[in-house]
Amino acid sequence: MKVILLQDVKGLGKKGEVVNASDGYARNFLFPKKLAAEATQGNVKTLNEQKTSQELKKQQEVEEAKELAKKIENSPIEIIAKAGDGGRLFGSVTSKDLAETLEKQHHIKIDKRKITLPEPIRELGVRHVEIKLHVGVVGKLTVNIKEA
């Protein structure tokens, strides 16, 4: 019997796949536990429509992320911090500071967890910081740290 899996089933397949299952296994286990639905023409058509709408949604998210990456690359930020001799900062500039400054200066809201900063910035100067906006979409933010 052909069934459409509504959830991942170990040993059978992943969610959204149309697979063959024995009649008894489908009727006695998969259907009662809502793990699968019978693969009728209507159900298969609905599944295909859902897959296409999900793909369109993913493409739209990627396009929005690419636009945001371009906007970020054209929006350098400037942070003024207290520094001592040799250009070392008192304290440091973290991803949280970068996210807040980006929102204040350019009205671009980014989650601080998306900012890739291996270690906090502790020196004056210009830095290039990567921001992971989506899978495969990375924006480069230019940060200029000046002395107060």
Swiss-Prot record:
Single GO BP term: translation
Record keyword Mitochondrion present: no
Keywords of this entry: Ribonucleoprotein, Ribosomal protein, RNA-binding, rRNA-binding
One GO MF term attached to the UniProt entry: rRNA binding
InterPro entries: Ribosomal_bL9 (IPR000244), Ribosomal_bL9/RNase_H1_N (IPR009027), Ribosomal_bL9_bac/chp (IPR020594), Ribosomal_bL9_C (IPR020069), Ribosomal_bL9_C_sf (IPR036791), Ribosomal_bL9_N (IPR020070), Ribosomal_bL9_N_sf (IPR036935)
One GO cellular component term: ribonucleoprotein complex
Described function: Binds to the 23S rRNA.
Family note: Belongs to the bacterial ribosomal protein bL9 family.
Protein name in the entry: Large ribosomal subunit protein bL9
Species the sequence originates in: Alkaliphilus oremlandii (strain OhILAs)
